[in-house]
């Protein structure tokens, strides 16, 4: 405990980050304006009144300190003269300035703790969202239980601001930040409606994303500390997680929650074969030991969210299942551990034995029903999966229509090429192919059969099923044994480590 306390005392000396003067620097808002100006959705019909001016920003900030503007509710913000005629533009410029300023100390801190070569190496290894699946294939086959965790959403913006105060000691900056977010929720009430947080997240996406990610990072840092402490692992690689002002207060609160016996509690948590993966607003905790240990972690997570972050979470948000009997959703896939049983005949002297061998394999399949729902939402088929035409695209040329459908099909094929079974993927391709043909026939005011017979587009539309082989031919030489083996064995999976984000059709979770 003393060595941690000495370390925290040194860490506090690095927390003298004075961000308040940066709020009045012109280059901060100039940078925010230049970034927003590049977004087409933000600069449409801005007009002369939307031009950036540091004088306007300073006037808005000075008005935020006036007492008569502290009783404004979110419903009256549109009529409030504080924001002037361009409330959305001015508030977003200030929000972008806040986001840029608050990111500076954490960027400098992470950059100073890592060497340039380590940053480049970590970026290359973790830039793809599919990099988690090879890890799961190596680790999850040895595990038995999995907890599907839904991270609770913060009910009040004050929680997000308060977490940030644990890291940066600058009272004027946080006072100004509170005054700014006051326009979007009523700070006098403890519970804020989801509509207020939703409005704030849409109006200030960069600032809200930073605050929310920091909220998730904060609870994960405490979890990582307990996990490493219980497994007797070295903590040097996680030194950045300990730089908090109220770290010991949190730790003492954990002692109270778990019967005032911190070392005894850690013995319950001791599990070297436990793995944690977070994606979007969910996370997965997998272990090899008995369910009692998973229930201990579930109990810990619920108390952590309620006691530290004032976020109420129902026990149903954490579901504990056996990997061999239940599947879990991960980044648009359905995954489970399948038992492969095989019988081997062994002959010893004059006796013959039958030995049953059980092997575990991580099965990752394409979720056909959620994908059909996504296609139906995009007007490519109905809810039953029957392809329909896309009349919205009928004004484009034939090549543009085919190129649009091919682009969607290639993206889905590229994303789901690591699945164990390709049958569902071929069904999705078939739906897109018929939807493309019906769209072309609708454009030419003809039937599908008459259009195909007249235009002879069957060979062109075969690209819906041949682009996978073309991609593999670019990766491997055509006469290579690896490519021939992949063609012979269709069940092999290939994970492309260049996928930075998921397709909108994949985002059905």
From Swiss-Prot:
GO terms for cellular component: chloroplast. Signal peptide: none annotated. It is found in: Plastid, Chloroplast. Its main location: plastid. It comes from the Eukaryota. Keywords: Chloroplast, mRNA processing, Plastid, RNA-binding, tRNA processing. GO terms for biological process: mRNA processing; RNA splicing; tRNA processing. This is Maturase K. The gene is matK. InterPro entries: Domain_X, Maturase_MatK, Maturase_MatK_N. Belongs to the intron maturase 2 family. MatK subfamily. It holds the Pfam family Intron_maturas2. The keyword Transmembrane does not apply. One of its GO terms (molecular function) is RNA binding. It comes from Cicer arietinum.
């Amino acid at each position: 405990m003393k060595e941690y306390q000495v370390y925290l005392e040194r860490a506090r000396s690095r927390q003298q980050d004075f961000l308040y003067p940066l709020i009045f620097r012109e280059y901060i808002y100039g940078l925010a304006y230049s970034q927003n100006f590049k977004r087409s959705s933000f600069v449409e019909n801005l007009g002369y009144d939307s031009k950036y001016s540091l004088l306007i920003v300073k006037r808005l900030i000075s008005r935020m300190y006036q007492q008569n503007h502290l009783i404004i509710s979110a419903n009256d913000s549109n009529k409030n003269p504080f924001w002037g005629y361009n409330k959305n533009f001015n508030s977003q410029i200030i929000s972008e300035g806040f986001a840029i300023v608050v990111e500076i100390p954490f960027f400098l801190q992470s950059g100073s703790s890592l060497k340039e070569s380590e940053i480049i190496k970590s970026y290359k290894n973790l830039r793809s969202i599919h990099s988690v699946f090879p890890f799961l294939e190596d680790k999850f086959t040895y595990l038995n239980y999995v907890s599907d965790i839904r991270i609770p959403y913060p009910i009040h913006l004050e929680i997000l601001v308060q977490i940030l105060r644990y890291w940066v000691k600058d009272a004027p900056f946080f006072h100004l930040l509170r005054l700014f977010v006051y326009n979007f929720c009523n700070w006098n009430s403890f519970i804020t409606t989801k509509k207020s947080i939703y409005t704030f997240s849409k109006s200030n996406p960069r600032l809200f994303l930073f605050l929310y990610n920091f909220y998730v990072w904060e609870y994960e840092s405490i979890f990582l500390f307990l996990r490493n402490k219980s497994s007797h692992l070295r903590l040097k690689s996680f030194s950045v997680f300990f730089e908090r002002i109220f770290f010991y207060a949190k730790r003492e609160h954990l002692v109270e929650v778990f019967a005032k016996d911190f070392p005894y509690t850690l013995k319950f948590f001791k599990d070297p074969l436990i793995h944690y993966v977070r994606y979007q607003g969910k996370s997965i905790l997998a272990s090899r030991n008995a369910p009692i240990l998973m229930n201990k972690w579930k109990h810990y997570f619920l108390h952590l969210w309620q006691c530290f972050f004032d976020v109420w979470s129902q026990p149903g948000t954490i579901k504990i299942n056996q990997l061999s009997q239940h599947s879990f959703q991960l980044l648009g896939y359905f995954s489970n551990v399948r038992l492969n049983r095989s019988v081997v005949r062994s002959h010893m002297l004059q006796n013959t034995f039958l030995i049953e061998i059980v092997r575990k394999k991580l099965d990752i399949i394409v979720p056909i029903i959620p994908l059909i729902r996504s296609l139906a939402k995009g007007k490519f088929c109905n809810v039953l999966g029957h392809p329909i035409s896309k009349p919205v695209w009928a004004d484009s040329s034939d090549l543009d229509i085919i190129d649009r459908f091919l682009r969607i099909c290639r993206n889905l094929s590229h994303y789901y090429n690591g699945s164990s079974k390709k049958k569902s993927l071929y069904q999705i391709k078939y739906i897109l192919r018929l939807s493309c043909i019906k769209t072309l026939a609708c454009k030419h005011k003809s039937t599908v059969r008459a259009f195909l017979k007249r235009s002879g587009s069957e060979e062109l539309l075969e690209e819906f099923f041949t682009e996978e082989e073309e991609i593999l031919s670019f990766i491997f030489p055509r006469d290579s044994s690896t490519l021939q083996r992949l063609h012979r064995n269709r069940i092999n999976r290939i994970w492309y480590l260049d996928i930075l984000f998921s397709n909108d059709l994949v985002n059905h979770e």
